[in-house]
Each structure stands twice: as structure tokens, then as C-alpha cells.
Amino acid sequence: DTLSLHDALPIYTFFTPFRNEIVPAYKTFQTEVNKWMQVYVEGKYVMFPLEKHWPDANSTLRITYGQLEGSAPTDGMRYTEHTTLDGIVAKYNTGNPDFELLPRMLDLHAAKNYGPYAQGDELWVCFTGSNHTTGGNSGSPVLDENGYLMGLNFDRSWESTMSDYLFDPNRCRNIVVDIRYVLWVMDIYSGAKHLVDEMTLMKE
């Protein structure tokens, strides 16, 4: 009786047939697709031996390279290579509820309390690079030339959404959250310095 009154029961009842019937059928179908995909790819090599054939990198380790740089995708428009906490506060000041901030964030910004994570008098939040990324790269580490963590990739610019099919190094940019901002949120904003103390921070 208690279970029948649970709010989640209708959802469970709805998804049970899906799990028991649709999921197994989908897995069978996907196995068949994978089998014939191998035949298709082999056929392409035979029919078009001089063409470039791109590998399927899904579920594999990938590496890409690029530079930290902005872009000018259209005439009269230019994106700088980084954003700062100033921009977050500027969006908050528009009154749009999507950009709501807690008072502590505003206080730390007003005091420019950026700790050791500032670059000059700014706290970088995100930066862009000319790395060729794709769907599924969110969370991928972005490393400098020495292998030190610079940030975490999480998106592409709007003008880069076609890069799975055509990569334009002058237009396509991946978007990365700066690891210094992540550390600042942990250490200064959230007061979790004990977590940062467990890490080895590399400083130039």
C-alpha cells in the first residue's frame, strides 16, 4: 500500500515496459548496425581508394591541439580569447534571473578578492582555443605545452557547430573553463581550501 502511493510509481510503471522490451530490441538493432557498418567502411576503401577516410573516434581516446586565441567570425564582430568575473557580474546586473548570483560572489568581486588565482587584476573564467573538439569532449582536460592543466573543455562557440564536418581554424573555437576559476570557487568562494591543499599547483 505504501509503495502504491509513492509519487514515483507512475514513472516506474511507464518505463518498465520500455526497459524490458525496447532496450533489448535496440541493443539487437545496434549490434546489427555495427556489423554492417564494418562492411560499409571496407567497401568504401575498395570503391574510393584515393579518398581520405576519417576514422570513427567514438568511444576512443582522442587528442587535439591548438592555441589560446579569440576569433572574428564575421565582419565587425570580434571575440576576445577570455572572459572574466567582471562579465558574470555584468550579466547579473541586467536583472535576468538566469544570471542570478549570491551576495558572496558580488562581495568577493567588489573587493577583488581573487587570492592567488588572478591574472593581473582580473579573474579569468573561461577562454577559447583553436582546438578541434566534438560532441562528447565536455570535461576533457586542456593542457599546456608542459602537460599542466589549464582548464576543462565544455563547449564550442556558436560559429563552430559545423566543425564536425568542416573545421575552419579561423572561425572554430572550443570553450574552456579556466582551472584557476575552478580553484577560486573551491578555495575562496566555497571555503574548501582543504581540497585545494591536497593538490600540487604549478605556478610559473
Task: Map each language-model feature to its residues.
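Catalytic nucleophile loop of clan PA
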Residues: 132-153
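An acidic- and aromatic-residue-enriched active-site/binding cleft used to recognize and process polar
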Residues: 66-68, 132, 154-158
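Intrinsically disordered or highly flexible coil/loop and linker segments, enriched in small
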Residues: 28, 50, 191-195
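C-terminal subregion of chymotrypsin/trypsin-like serine protease catalytic domains
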Residues: 146-204
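Hydrophobic alpha-helical scaffolding
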Residues: 12, 53, 136, 168, ...
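Extended, charge-rich low-complexity regions and/or helical-solenoid scaffolds
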Residues: 40-123, 128-129
